[in-house]
Amino acid sequence: RIRTFFNRIEVDSSAVLDSGSSGATYGLRLLQALKETDLQVHLVITPAGWLNLRHETGVTDTQALQLAHTLHASTNLAASIASGSFQTMGMIVAPCSMRTLAAIAHGLGDNLLTRAADVTLKERRRLVLMTRESPLSLVHLRNMTAATEAGAIICPPIPALYQRPASIDEMVDHSVARALDLLGLPQGLAGEWEGF
């Protein structure tokens, strides 16, 4: 499970979690991109996440499950990713609801998603939160600040219009590529900006 790469140790495992916020397309596209790699992907989807995934994408549970190596029930606090001894390259919560953000910002590991996020932070691994809400209240902003101070990276899926995307898919791909880049994971979704 562990390999040496350019003088650093990497663990070929990552966690992807869907908290139930609108924007399930981001989580789905992230899983599709990770499926193209040799990484072991651990997936947690909350009950609200399943509802949004079905409603927003039309994807069935079976289709979603084929995109991950391991699916963990959001209630299973004894899962491997709930322990710091299970090493991962990091974790992406896509999309990240404001409820999940609040729980992560304040260390509330009340389900597997928030527990795994807490473990990721305490082990000093990268945690990327693709927060989805607009407009933002002062409470949301303070929770983003607290999560950032704890070590999380707030990465809202904001379209990069300077790239002149031709479709919604290209906008989604760019946001997912940014999240993968933040974990140092391979992605073939969007290239680097080269200027004009």
Residue ranges of model-derived segments:
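A cross-family phosphate/adenosyl-ligand binding-site feature
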Residues: R8-F196
